[in-house]
């Protein structure tokens, strides 16, 4: 019994140290934003206990208040890979004014000059199936039918009932599990 209690105490001590480190990282990343930081700590705590897989959320606010800094310098630095102590890879996709879903999900490989989309590009570049992907300027996506296509692709990416089978048009028929 004492060995079991010692094991529980060691695990709790490790979690407590991690949460204190996460608090410091978030405070160093950006001043203020107490509500957002509290919510991020709650989400990270869920990841740490192993009961939460991928998670999608959004930051809202006027330009220049620190949304990108909170994600890049805060969240990405808080999430550490247990294998090599590296931080979670971070990728940035600005989509303001975009009017073509192929930017995200690729072009069919039969077209001359076709290529895979930005999502697959990030996975290959970061050599990771669960990087933090920050999609900026969602409110500025074209309101045309092509803009609706972009919103549909993004919905597929964040919907936990669908994102375990994302397909880039370039790699037609190959499911990518983005649920982690």
Task: Say what each PLM segment does.
Residues 47-53, 89, 115-117, 162-172:
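Active-site phosphate-binding and catalytic loops of NTP-dependent enzymes
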Residues 135-175:
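Conserved catalytic/switch belt of AAA+ P-loop NTPases
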Residues 53-94, 124-125:
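Walker A/P-loop
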Residues 52-57, 129-131, 179-180:
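Pre-Walker A (Motif I) flank of P-loop NTPase domains
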Residues 15-60, 119-120:
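Pre-Walker A (pre-P-loop) alpha-helix and adjacent loop at the N terminus of AAA/AAA+ ATPase modules
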Residues 93-121, 147-159:
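Conserved AAA+ P-loop NTPase core
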Residues 1-18:
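Interdomain "pre-motor" coupling segment immediately N-terminal to P-loop NTPase/helicase cores
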Residues 110-133, 167-175:
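Conserved alpha-helical scaffold flanking the Walker A/P-loop in AAA+ ATPase domains
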């Amino acid at each position: 019994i004492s060995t079991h209690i010692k094991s529980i105490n060691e695990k709790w001590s490790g979690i407590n140290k991690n949460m204190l480190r996460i608090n410091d990282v978030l405070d160093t990343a950006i001043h203020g934003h107490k509500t957002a930081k509290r919510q991020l700590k709650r989400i990270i705590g869920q990841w740490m206990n192993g009961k939460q897989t991928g998670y999608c959320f959004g930051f809202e606010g006027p330009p220049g208040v620190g949304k990108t800094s909170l994600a890049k310098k805060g969240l990405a630095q808080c999430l550490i890979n247990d294998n090599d102590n590296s931080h979670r890879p971070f990728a940035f996709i600005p989509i303001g004014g975009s009017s073509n879903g192929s930017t995200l999900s690729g072009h069919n490989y039969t077209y001359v000059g076709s290529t895979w989309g930005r999502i697959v590009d990030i996975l290959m570049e970061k050599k990771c199936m669960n990087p933090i992907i920050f999609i900026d300027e969602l409110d500025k996506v074209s309101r045309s039918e092509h803009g609706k296509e972009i919103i549909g692709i993004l919905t597929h990416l964040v919907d936990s009932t669908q994102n375990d089978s994302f397909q880039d048009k370039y790699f037609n028929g190959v499911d990518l599990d983005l649920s982690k």
